[in-house]
């Protein structure tokens, strides 16, 4: 703060100094000079040194002689900036900027080139500065530049000899830069190479080679533009447009005062921002340490968990390996047992398959037999039915045949009679007259009589006895008819007997085959005698079959029981055979099952008890596992509190007591802090009063002094030495703050209008420029001063112990006050820190109480978990023992139950096992069944036949052999009957014609009557014939129908009988009995065998599956064993490798004291995925956090290798080390970054409060700014006037004088008026803490000048420009030219020579101004070299050149001119340059002249 105010004082008091004359010489100090220019390996100059004249050096020569190249070398050595160098007369026209070589590439030759300036400064030091140039290969024609300087070289050493090495008398080699360095250092001189142009120019400024320190590229640009303007002559628009930047010096005092004020405010605000940034950094560091801890600790705990998990996995793999081996052994034993059992089942299955196939074939045969039997029964029924129908039909046919024959006979007789009648009628009709008819009738009667005689064999037959004979024959016919009827009856009876006999005979033959008719009765009698027995046997067949089935079932059960017994003995490894042994063993097994069940129940109860205990312990373990992370977090928080507080807490009450003590301690520290704050404020007020630039303790005095046009007395005595300060302080007494004015009377008039002024205002009349203490009559005493105020008033003032009169006294007292303030501030900071620390500690304790107090003092959950886990493991071992015992008991119990099941199956079948006669009974029953089935088959085949035979069997006793004789008698009787009837008919005809015998006399009269009778008889007989014909036809049809039915029945009978015989033959060939239960028995047998086969197959399939499963399990077990072994070995290798890495991690963490940070036990309860997620999230945050820190970034990148977890620990150590290095040990008294972050937070909070208060004190008023700007502008206006006085005598051609015109811009004048006027309109800008003063003044400028477009510039940039007084001024150059008077200096209004002269004058003013500006920052014994250029001097006439020479002599300035050959100045040194070409070699021949005199 003191430095800022002192700088401001310097600024404000420069106005009181007289501005020096621009062309005044520096008395006592010689100006530095350029001695020579050396060009090495330039185009035309292999090694040439041009000695420079102290005034003017002229380069004379024709076009292309090398004048511009020489000047280019000089400029390049002076300003080696490729961005600025631009030699226009050699630049390729129309070339693009990318390929343009700026005219330098073509001036060089291939290889190493040099351009060096040999100078001697005001200290008589020889300095060689230069640049090494080298063409860069490529189409862009680039040039590489390296700057260097050489000091300590003797004056006798030629610069050319430094840069070359002489090979022989005519040859030399250019040295490289390294060779040059070695050569210079070997000679004892100092060689230095520069890596930046700024360093190069800084050296040149410090040693007095250039007039201004070129700090930036803009400074170099100004210098180059000045050189360029000098080189090409004329008025440079680039310079005249920005003449303020060249001529008006930066008011370093004012600017520095504003900058210091701004920088102080900015620094203060930046400090506040930095505090915020630091707080953000603190948050970042906190974030960094938190994320680093999360990143590394999560990986650390994950690796620890994985290591523990890997070890457990290795043990599990080994256990799995051993377990798989034991399972393989058991599997192999089981495989052998099951293979043996599978072989037995396979053999048994083959037997069962054969039996089942036999049963299936038997079932098929039975089914076929049953189907055949059904067909036989059906056919037997059909045949029996057909036989009956056939017999009936035969009788019907015979009856129909007899009717047919009788009808035929009647029809034939009627037909014969009709024929007779027709013949008679024909005969009668032939005789148309009666005689003829009578004669005919008579003749016919005679014929009939003759016929009757013939037929009857009666010779004596006559008309008279014809009746007798007729009656006799009728009686005979009746006798024959009776006989025929009798015979017919006998025939019927005989025919029936014959039919029954035949039928019975056929039935017997059907049963027993062909037998003689005589033996039929015996066969029938034997069949009928055995028929009831066979029928009874057939009826007993189902019972016998059921009995046989039952016996076979018992046999099967006996066989099953035998197999079951054998199986039982095999399984039980016993040899029990008798029922007593089995029952005894049964009792033993029952007792064993009861004992094992009771023992198993006890084990189950105990196991349940242990499981309940295990569940309780598991619940307790899980509860503590859930509680453990929070408890560990609480313990970590408790440890942090104990570390922060230095106390040990045994219970929660101790924590509460400590919090209460902290509150009391905080109140004490707060009271001390407030007292120190009060002391600091008092010291700040004193320092603020003493820090006023003019020594006034009241700012109103400055306003009044400016208003009255006076100067503060303290300002006039500001330079009083400190030893005189007590005297002058006592001399003026209360008037030490008086205002010195030129005229008291003028001031008196203004006193009445004063509103704001101190209570006591002292005014002293005098000249502020020549004021002394003669105005007072005083006498100095030992301890004070007596002042005669008036004739009647004396004032005695003691010498003050702490004088404040004068800047030196104030500064001394300020130093004391500031030291005291710093001490108070340090104590205040310490107390504030303590208060903050107490508050933070109390806050931490409050957080701990709210979050962790309930858990922190409970038992360690991990210890409880360890005890619980131990108990749980013991219970697990006991449970495993119980499970093993229970498994053994269950196996024994299952075996016993299985034996009991087998015994339960065996015991009911004990009687079967003891039944030895079962097989014999089955054989006996089977024989009876065979007989019964044979009888049943016989009855089934012939039962119907026998039942038909039984009622007619007696007919077989007598064979009806007389049937043929009776039939012959019957036929004979029929024949006799027919003959007798013929005779009767013949006699009847005679009897009927008896009357015709009388026609002998009356034939004529009776012919017609006879004819009618014959006709009626004929008609009657015809009708009878037709009736008989119809009856015959019907009888024939009926007979044919009956005969057809008979034929059909006979055909059906024959086919069905044949089929029946075939079926009986086939069923006989099948060889099975087709009884009612045969199918059921076959099916039951088949189903039983199928069930046994299915059971056997299921058992075999199950066993084969078990074998396949065991084989696959064996393969799986083999793979499992290999895998378990491989996994175990891999896991063991992994554990071994992880152990090595883990040992490295532990060693690093323990040696670096970070194990406690990394071993966060609460993370051990998170899963690997959660820890990996936590680590990955932290890694992502860390990548952002360390992005700007290369070391940490590389460490973090290395730590990402998961194969090397130790790199993460190294990264954590690097973070800790990095944060430790960032700890300021002067502020923070700790090495722990986490504690440092806490202390930093407290310290930053305190600094924020302090700096916020300081910002309010640093603010400067707008009125003060306006006053400072006005004073500075007034001073610079005076300096410009002094410059104009030095330019009045400069004349070039018609230009008689040159001057500078400076004016204040209207817009800026309005700004100054606003700053010093009413502040109510813009006070909001300067009271806004968010804006700097520069931004506030920029905003005010924009308000006052809204029409001005500020473009894209920020308010800060505009404000900084407004704090530079040069921006308030407009500066122009005017020339007085002939009759035109004062004109603005422009190239178009002046001739070439006038423009060059005017421009050169302006440049001289600029150089002089620069030297004056830099005088304060350059050594006092250094006056810089002063040299300008002028190319193409032919544009100046001889008078102008002489004027330039005179100007150079007056200003002690060197000038380098390039002129054509026709110009030869009389003064200075002239070099004639001639470019010569000899063969392929080109060089410039140089001849040096001083004036027109001798050649050097």
UniProtKB/Swiss-Prot annotation:
GO terms, molecular function: ATP binding; DNA binding
One Pfam family, short name: MukB
Biological process according to GO: cell division; chromosome condensation; chromosome segregation; DNA replication
Coiled-coil segments: 332-496, 537-608, 665-692, 806-832, 862-1066, 1101-1139, 1235-1290
Localization terms from the record: Cytoplasm, Nucleoid
Binding-site positions, ATP: 61-68
Keywords from the UniProt entry: ATP-binding, Cell cycle, Cell division, Chromosome partition, Coiled coil, Cytoplasm, DNA condensation, DNA-binding, Nucleotide-binding
UniProt main location, coarse: cytoplasm
Superkingdom classification of source: Bacteria
GO cellular component terms, A-Z: cytoplasm; nucleoid
Protein task: Plays a central role in chromosome condensation, segregation and cell cycle progression. Functions as a homodimer, which is essential for chromosome partition. Involved in negative DNA supercoiling in vivo, and by this means organize and compact chromosomes. May achieve or facilitate chromosome segregation by condensation DNA from both sides of a centrally located replisome during cell division.
Stored HAMAP family: MukB
Similarity comment text for this entry: Belongs to the SMC family. MukB subfamily.
Description of how the protein assembles with itself and partners: Homodimerization via its hinge domain. Binds to DNA via its C-terminal region. Interacts, and probably forms a ternary complex, with MukE and MukF via its C-terminal region. The complex formation is stimulated by calcium or magnesium. Interacts with tubulin-related protein FtsZ.
Domain notes: The hinge domain, which separates the large intramolecular coiled coil regions, allows the homodimerization, forming a V-shaped homodimer.
Protein's UniProt name: Chromosome partition protein MukB
Gene transcribed to yield this protein: mukB
């Amino acid at each position: 703060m003191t430095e800022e105010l002192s700088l401001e004082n310097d600024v404000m008091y420069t106005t009181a100094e007289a501005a020096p004359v621009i062309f005044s010489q520096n008395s006592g100090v010689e100006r530095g000079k350029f001695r020579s220019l050396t060009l090495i390996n330039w185009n035309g100059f292999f090694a040439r040194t041009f000695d420079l004249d102290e005034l003017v050096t002229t380069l004379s020569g024709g076009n292309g002689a090398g004048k511009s190249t020489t000047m280019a070398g000089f400029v390049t050595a002076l300003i080696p900036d490729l961005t600025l160098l631009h030699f226009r007369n050699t630049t390729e026209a129309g070339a693009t900027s990318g390929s343009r070589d700026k005219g330098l590439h073509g001036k060089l030759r291939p290889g190493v080139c040099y351009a060096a300036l040999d100078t001697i400064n005001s200290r008589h030091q020889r300095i060689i500065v230069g640049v090494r140039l080298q063409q860069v290969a490529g189409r862009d024609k680039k040039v590489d530049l390296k700057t260097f300087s050489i000091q300590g070289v003797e004056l006798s050493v030629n610069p050319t000899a430094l840069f070359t090495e002489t090979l022989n008398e005519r040859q030399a080699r250019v040295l490289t830069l390294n060779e040059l360095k070695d050569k210079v250092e070997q000679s004892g001189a100092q060689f230095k190479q520069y890596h930046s142009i700024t360093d190069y120019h800084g050296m040149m400024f410090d040693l007095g080679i250039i007039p201004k320190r070129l700090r930036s590229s803009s400074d170099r640009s100004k210098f180059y533009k000045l050189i360029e303007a000098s080189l090409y002559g004329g008025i440079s628009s680039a310079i005249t447009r920005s003449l303020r930047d060249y001529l008006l010096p930066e008011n370093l005092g004012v600017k520095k005062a504003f900058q210091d004020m701004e920088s102080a405010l900015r620094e203060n605000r930046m400090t506040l921002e930095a505090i915020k940034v630091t707080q953000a950094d603190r948050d970042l560091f906190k974030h960094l340490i938190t994320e680093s801890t999360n990143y590394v600790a999560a990986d650390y705990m994950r690796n620890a968990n994985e290591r523990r998990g890997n070890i457990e996995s290795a043990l599990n793999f080994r256990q799995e390996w051993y377990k798989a081996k034991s399972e393989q052994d058991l599997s192999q034993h089981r495989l052998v047992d099951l293979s043996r059992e599978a072989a037995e089942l396979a053999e048994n299955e083959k037997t069962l398959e054969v039996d089942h196939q036999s049963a299936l074939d038997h079932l098929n045969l039975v089914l076929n037999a049953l189907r055949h039997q059904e067909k036989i029964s059906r056919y037997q029924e059909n045949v029996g039915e057909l036989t009956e129908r056939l017999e009936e039909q035969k009788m019907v046919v015979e009856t129909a045949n007899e009717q047919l024959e009788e009808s035929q006979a009647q029809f034939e007789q009627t037909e014969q009679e009709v024929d007779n009648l027709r013949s008679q009628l024909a005969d009668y009709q032939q005789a148309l007259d009666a005689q003829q008819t009578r004669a005919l009738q008579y003749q016919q009667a005679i014929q009939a009589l003759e016929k009757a005689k013939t037929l009857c064999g009666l010779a004596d037959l006559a008309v008279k006895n014809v009746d007798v004979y007729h009656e006799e024959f009728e009686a005979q016919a009746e006798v024959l008819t009776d006989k025929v009827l009798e015979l017919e009856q006998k025939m019927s009876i005989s025919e029936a007997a014959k039919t029954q006999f035949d039928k019975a005979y056929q039935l017997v033959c059907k049963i027993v085959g062909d037998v003689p008719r005589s033996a039929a009765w015996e066969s029938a009698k034997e069949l009928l005698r055995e028929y009831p027995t066979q029928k009874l046997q057939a009826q007993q067949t189902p019972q016998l079959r059921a009995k046989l089935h039952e016996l076979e079932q018992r046999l099967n059960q006996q066989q099953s029981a035998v197999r079951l017994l054998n199986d039982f003995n095999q399984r039980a490894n016993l040899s029990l055979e008798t029922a007593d042994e089995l029952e005894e063993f049964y009792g033993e097994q029952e007792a064993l099952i009861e004992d094992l069940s009771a023992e198993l129940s006890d084990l189950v109860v105990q196991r349940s008890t242990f499981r309940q205990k295990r569940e309780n312990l598991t619940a307790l373990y899980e509860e503590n596992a859930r509680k453990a992370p929070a408890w560990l977090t609480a313990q970590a928080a408790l440890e942090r509190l104990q570390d922060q507080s230095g106390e040990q807490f045994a219970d929660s009450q101790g924590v509460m007591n400590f919090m209460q003590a902290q509150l009391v301690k905080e109140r004490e520290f707060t009271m001390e802090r407030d007292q120190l704050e009060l002391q600091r404020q008092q010291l700040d007020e004193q320092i603020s009063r003493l820090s006023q630039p003019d020594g006034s303790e009241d700012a109103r005095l400055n306003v009044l002094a400016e208003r009255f046009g006076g100067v503060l007395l303290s300002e006039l005595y500001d330079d009083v030495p400190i030893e005189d300060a007590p005297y002058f302080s006592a001399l003026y007494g209360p008037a030490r703050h008086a205002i010195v004015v030129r005229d008291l009377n003028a001031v008196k008039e203004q006193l009445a209008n004063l509103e704001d002024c101190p209570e006591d205002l002292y005014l002293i009349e005098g000249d502020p420029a020549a004021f002394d203490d003669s105005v007072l009559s005083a006498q100095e005493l030992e301890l004070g001063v007596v002042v005669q105020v008036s004739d009647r008033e004396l004032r005695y003032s003691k010498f003050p112990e702490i004088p404040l009169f004068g800047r030196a006294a104030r500064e001394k007292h300020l130093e004391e006050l500031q030291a005291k303030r710093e001490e108070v501030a340090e104590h205040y900071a310490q107390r504030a820190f303590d208060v903050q620390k107490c508050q933070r500690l109390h806050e931490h304790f409050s957080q701990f109480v709210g979050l962790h107090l309930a858990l922190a003092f409970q038992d360690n959950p991990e210890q409880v978990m360890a005890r619980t886990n131990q108990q749980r493991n013991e219970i697990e071992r006991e449970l495993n023992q119980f499970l093993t015992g229970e498994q053994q008991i269950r196996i024994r119990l299952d075996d016993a139950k299985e034996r009991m099941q087998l015994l339960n199956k065996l015991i009911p079948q004990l009687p079967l096992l003891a039944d030895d006669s079962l097989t014999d009974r089955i054989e006996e029953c089977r024989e009876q069944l065979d007989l019964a089935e044979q009888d049943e088959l016989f009855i089934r085949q012939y039962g119907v036949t026998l039942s038909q035979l039984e009622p007619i069997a007696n007919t077989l006793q007598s064979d009806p052999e007389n049937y043929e004789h009776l039939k012959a008698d019957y036929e004979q009787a029929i024949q006799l009957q027919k003959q007798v009837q013929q005779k009767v008919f013949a006699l009847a005809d005679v009897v009927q014609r008896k009357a015709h015998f009388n026609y002998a006399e009356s034939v004529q009269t009776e012919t017609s009557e006879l004819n009618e009778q014959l006709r009626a008889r004929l008609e009657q007989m015809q009708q009878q014939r037709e009736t008989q014909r119809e009856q015959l036809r019907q009888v024939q049809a009926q007979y044919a129908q009956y005969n057809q039915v008979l034929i059909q029945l006979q055909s059906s009978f024959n086919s069905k009988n044949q089929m029946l015989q075939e079926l009986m033959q086939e069923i006989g060939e099948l060889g099975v009995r087709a009884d009612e239960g045969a199918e059921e028995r076959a099916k039951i047998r088949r189903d039983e065998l199928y069930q046994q086969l299915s059971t056997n197959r299921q058992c075999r399939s199950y066993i084969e599956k078990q074998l396949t499963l065991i084989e696959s399990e064996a393969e799986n077990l083999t793979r499992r064993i290999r895998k378990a072994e491989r996994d175990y070995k891999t896991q063991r290798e992994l554990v071994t490798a992880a152990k090595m890495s883990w040992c490295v991690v532990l060693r690093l963490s323990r040696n670096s004291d970070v194990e406690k940070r990394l071993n966060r036990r609460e993370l051990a309860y998170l899963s690997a995925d959660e820890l990996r997620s936590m680590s990955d999230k932290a890694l992502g945050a860390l990548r952002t956090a360390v992005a700007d820190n290369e070391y940490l970034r590389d460490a973090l990148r290395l730590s990402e290798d998961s194969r090397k977890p130790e790199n993460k620990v190294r990264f954590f150590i690097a973070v800790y080390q990095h944060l430790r290095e960032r700890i300021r040990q002067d502020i923070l008294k700790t090495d722990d970054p986490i504690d440092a972050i806490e202390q930093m937070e407290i310290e930053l909070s305190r600094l924020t409060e302090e700096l916020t208060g300081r910002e309010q004190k640093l603010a400067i008023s707008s009125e003060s700014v306006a006053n400072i700007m006005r004073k500075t502008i007034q001073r610079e206006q005076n300096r410009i006037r002094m410059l104009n006085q030095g330019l009045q005598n400069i004349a070039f051609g018609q230009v008689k004088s040159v001057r500078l015109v400076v004016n204040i811009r209207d817009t800026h004048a309005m700004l100054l008026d606003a700053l010093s006027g009413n502040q109510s309109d813009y006070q909001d800008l300067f009271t806004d803490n968010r804006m700097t003063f520069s931004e506030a003044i920029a905003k005010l400028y924009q308000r006052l000048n809204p029409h001005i477009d500020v473009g894209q510039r920020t308010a800060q940039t505009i404000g900084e420009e407004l704090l530079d007084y040069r921006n308030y001024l407009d500066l122009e150059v005017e020339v007085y030219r002939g009759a035109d008077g004062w004109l603005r200096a422009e190239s178009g209004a002046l001739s070439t020579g006038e423009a060059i002269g005017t421009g050169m004058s302006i440049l001289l003013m600029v150089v002089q101004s620069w030297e004056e500006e830099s005088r304060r920052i350059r050594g006092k014994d250094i006056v810089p070299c002063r040299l300008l250029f002028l190319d193409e001097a032919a544009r100046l006439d001889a008078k102008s050149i002489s004027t330039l020479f005179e100007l150079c002599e007056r200003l002690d300035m060197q000038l380098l001119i390039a002129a054509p050959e026709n110009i030869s100045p009389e003064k200075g040194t002239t070099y004639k340059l001639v470019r010569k070409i000899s063969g392929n070699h080109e060089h410039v021949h140089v001849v040096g002249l001083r004036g027109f005199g001798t050649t050097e």
